[in-house]
Amino acid sequence: MGITHELDIFLVSEDIAMKHVELHKGNSYGCVLNIKSSCRKQMKIIFVLKPDWTEIDSIKPIQMEADGIYIDVTIIKQSFYEVIYCSNFTIYGDSVINIFSDIDRCTKEKYPIININIDKKKYEIIESGYTYIYIQSPIDKEDKLTYMRDDYVDEYNSSDDDCIDYYDCDYDDDDNNDAEDEDEE
């Protein structure tokens, strides 16, 4: 029958979901994202892998490169049914992001290629490869509730000392009196 994993990729920072990024059959998953941006951009990607355990004992880790530089991908939740990964990184203009589980060239050629223009808020599948990929934007509410919950994000952010969560900061017009702001609450 063959191995059939399921991989969904959520580009949280751009509210784009790429569904079924796995190969039709085989123990491999990944894609190429051509990101077009005119400025520096903080990116957050969540990967949801639902492994097919019928013929394998372990799953291959998801790896990622942005313009040839390795990017950390961290497991934030793991169960028998799914493995959820997260990655936060910054791009500085146009970038090519390779997401993969295999490094051999033959397998990588089967991965889909997606263009995402951040400035114009447009995306398109250039090559679907050997997948049934489709794109949703915005990310549907069920996926947001299931995979983008605060406890996942907090757990990931707390494990990364270099990551600053700007949403937790108290910014207001008179930024000099944060202690007074806490007293008023």
Curated annotation (Swiss-Prot):
Q: What does this protein do?
A: Plays a role for multiplication of the virus in different cell types.
Concerning its family, UniProt says:
Belongs to the poxviridae C7 protein family.
Q: What domain of life does the native source organism fall in? A: Viruses
Query: Does the record's keyword annotation contain Secreted?
Result: no
Keywords noted in UniProt: Early protein
The UniProt entry's GO biological process terms, in alphabetical order, are: viral process
Q: What is this protein called?
A: Probable host range protein 2
